[in-house]
Regions:
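Boundary/entry segment of secreted carbohydrate-active catalytic domains
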Residues: 2-53, 58-65, 365-371
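Acidic (Asp/Glu)-rich catalytic clusters
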Residues: 27-28, 49-57, 77-90, 149-156, ...
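Aromatic-lined carbohydrate-recognition surfaces of secreted/lumenal glycan-active proteins
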Residues: 35-39, 162-164, 191-217, 270-283
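Alpha-helical scaffolding within the catalytic cores
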Residues: 21, 43-51, 77-80, 144-147, ...
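Substrate-binding cleft of extracellular glycoside hydrolase catalytic domains
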Residues: 71-193, 200, 204
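Aromatic- and acid-rich polysaccharide-binding/catalytic face
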Residues: 62, 215-249, 301-303
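Substrate-binding cleft of secreted/luminal carbohydrate-active enzymes
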Residues: 30-41, 271-374
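Loop/turn elements at helix/coil->beta-strand transitions in domains of secreted/extracellular proteins
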Residues: 31-35, 57-60, 88-93, 154-160, ...
Length: 375
């Protein structure tokens, strides 16, 4: 079938009015503005307090994770947070999946992991081979994730879903097998398994698909994803806006290159897909984006001390009002004010009023304001 980047690849999504409302918004801003996003760590939401304290505003989108939806320890906290964010504040939701599987498929009580280095006996090849224990685990987990997405669907929440992220590297178990091969058929099979199971078996209508393979060997057909993303973390002593802009500009070109391989799968010149900086460690400079025409659909800065000043043990350094400060190595209040105030960036306050969500600030922010003001 013809590749049409102006419509969601999901036939089910095209029939969901709320999903199409969000889709049409994404298409309308792409190439004109960039949506701000941050990855959430937990319900404490200290990252929110950093941005709100500096600007009175929040990112337009938040990133969540199905990391606790499978494995030995399970929790629906991330699902609850996403639903509240969408319905209370009208914010957009992105989901990735740090997919925990048994470290040893023959010993499920031996713990779960998603890092390749921690897994001793879970074959990626078996994961896409019917009749194996790994295959049964994979199908079980996909079906479990489907129940979480179905719950959000029933609440009117659309998600930008980014499974099998950073697959071009070997640090996650779903990463490349046989890097020197022309294609990595195992990855492609796993991607299509997830897509087919959620689209055709569960018939979910609230998914906008994000491919984040970021390697020629993970190229997939463009009719199985809507957005192409790249995760890149700048790591250099020169942290000037100019240096970071130069780095992100090269990342944009790199992603365009990856997209050409997906176009080749379909036998076309280009996919026309929207491009995103799906993970990063520094907020990009809006003026740098404008000057270099690297118009990401959105950028998503990671959580924790990528945003707040660390205080030890993974927690932020708090003042007497329990307010975290920006990590001075990466952010400042002035930078947040300037970037959020730039008309290129879409923040929560700049989003339109969607039919699926409210316009209230999160309860965590209200509680913080109450105590800060002596309540």
């Amino acid at each position: 079938k013809e590749v049409d980047a102006t419509k969601p690849v999901s036939e089910n999504a095209r029939k969901n009015e709320k999903t199409m409302e969000e889709w049409n918004y994404l298409r309308s801003v792409y190439g004109k503005q960039v949506i701000t996003c941050q990855q959430m760590m937990d319900s404490e939401a200290y990252e929110d307090l950093v941005f709100y304290n500096a600007s009175g505003d929040l990112t337009a989108m938040k990133g969540f994770d199905f990391i606790f939806s499978t494995g030995s320890y399970t929790s629906d906290d991330m699902i609850d947070m996403a639903i509240e964010w969408s319905k209370t504040s009208g914010g957009l939701c992105a989901f990735t999946w740090h997919w925990n599987v048994p470290k040893d498929i023959d010993n499920p009580s031996g713990g779960y992991a998603f890092y390749t280095s921690e897994i001793t006996n879970f074959s990626q090849i078996n994961a896409v081979t019917p009749g194996t224990k790994e295959y049964e685990t994979v199908i079980h987990d996909i079906d479990l994730i489907a129940t979480k997405i179905q719950r959000m669907e029933s609440e009117g929440v659309t998600i930008l879903f980014r499974p099998l992220h950073e697959a071009g590297n070997a640090w996650f178990w779903w990463g490349l097998q046989g890097r020197d091969s022309a294609t990595n058929e195992v990855f492609q099979k796993l991607w299509y398994m997830i897509y087919d199971r959620l689209e055709n078996y569960h018939k979910l209508s609230n998914i906008i698909w994000v491919w984040n393979g970021q390697n020629p060997h993970t190229a997939i057909h463009p009719n199985s994803y809507d957005i192409a993303g790249i995760d890149r973390y700048y790591d250099n002593e020169d942290t000037s806006a100019e240096a970071i802009t130069k780095y992100y500009t090269s990342c944009y070109s790199e992603l365009q290159g990856f997209e050409k391989y997906c176009a080749e799968v379909a036998g076309i010149e280009e996919t026309g897909k929207m491009l995103t900086l799906s993970e990063c460690g520094y907020m990009p400079d809006p003026e740098g984006i404008r000057a270099n025409n690297t118009m990401w659909l959105y950028y998503m800065i990671w959580n924790g001390d990528f945003i707040y000043e660390p205080g030890g043990g993974g927690s932020p350094l708090l003042d007497l009002d329990s307010t975290p400060s920006p990590n001075p190595k990466r952010l400042s209040n002035e930078m947040i004010q300037n970037y959020f105030g730039n008309d290129l960036f879409v923040t929560l306050n700049k989003l339109p009023e969607f039919s699926f969500g409210g316009r209230d600030i999160p309860q965590k922010i209200k509680n913080w304001e109450f105590y800060k003001n002596g309540g």
